[in-house]
Amino acid sequence: MNALLLTSTGAQIDGAWRNAIGDEAEKVVQRLLIKEAVKRTMLVAFINKNGTGIEPYNDAKLEEQLGNIEAYRGVKLTNQTSILFSSEPDISLVGKNNVTLGVIEVKGGTDPAGALERYGAAKKSFESTLREAPDAKTILIASCITPEAKERIDKDKTISCYFNLTEVIKEKQKYTELVELIFSVLHG
């Protein structure tokens, strides 16, 4: 009985740990996009999650706002577009007329055994988006892309492009490719 309880507790801790890794990966990408919007002098305001409106961008408060990223459901940009955060898709790139221009799925898990499952979850989210917005750009950012997952992603018409999160963080060229793509989508 005790062994069963310990096994169950271990699985719960493992699951919670994996969820935390995924949540943190999303926050990394959210912060990266906000910092890039600041660099491009495009950030206007943070959109509060609790429905109390917007919080104007203030350079003096940026680090505090980035540290409390979960309090926001997105940001508004100078060209009247928005970057919105949610659970599915993880990030939406929304145009002036509330049209979805693109979506980003962030898969932060690093266990190779779960790579196909994460790919499948992203694909499902992208299919849902494309039913509503057939011209939307779909971007997968994953920490672990196995050869099998890469082969499927390369053949998958629902995924416009994909990036390895570790490469985006470590390699300036990959970072630049990602942000250029995202901000070109937002410029429509």
Task: Identify the role of each PLM range.
Residues 1-53:
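Interdomain/boundary linker segments immediately adjacent to catalytic/signaling cores
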Residues 45-188:
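Catalytic core segments in nucleotide and nucleic-acid processing enzymes
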